[in-house]
């Protein structure tokens, strides 16, 4: 077991280039502007990528407009956005790397069991970035910070899938 922990930390070191303090602050400040828009974020992802919506049995085949005001949708959106918020809260501090790795590893394991592909994770990423960039003050620095942060997280995720 220790071998796997050491291997995982080596992977983190190889993949993740920690965000600078300025980058982490920029990701956190832009996320703070949208993090309470859980339903809108998930609705935007589902609208842009219906194949992602199809992976959720309770939402598959339904019009996004007809489900986005339901309690089930709000609950699920809260879980997804809550996970993103948890990861973002941990960035910018290298001592949090093991916690990030654990959370991302759990996400990978649960989604691998459901057959979720890297392509679908990349679609989610694109939908998330599209929503954030359309709803905050977005500039080259924000784009660079988000790209670096998401590259780190998705690198960990894909290594664990």
Swiss-Prot record:
Single GO MF descriptor: oxygen binding
Signal peptide from the UniProt entry: 1-16
InterPro entries per UniProt: Erythrocruorin, Globin, Globin-like_sf, Globin/Proto, Mb-like_M
Entry keyword Magnesium: no
Domain Globin: from-to ranges: 18-161
Gene3D superfamilies assigned to the protein according to its UniProt record, in alphabetical order: Globins
GO cellular component, one term: hemoglobin complex
Other remarks in the entry: There are at least 12 different components in Midge globin.
Subunit structure: Homodimer.
Family from the record: Belongs to the globin family.
Name of the protein this chain belongs to: Globin CTT-VIIA
Organism expressing this protein natively: Chironomus thummi thummi
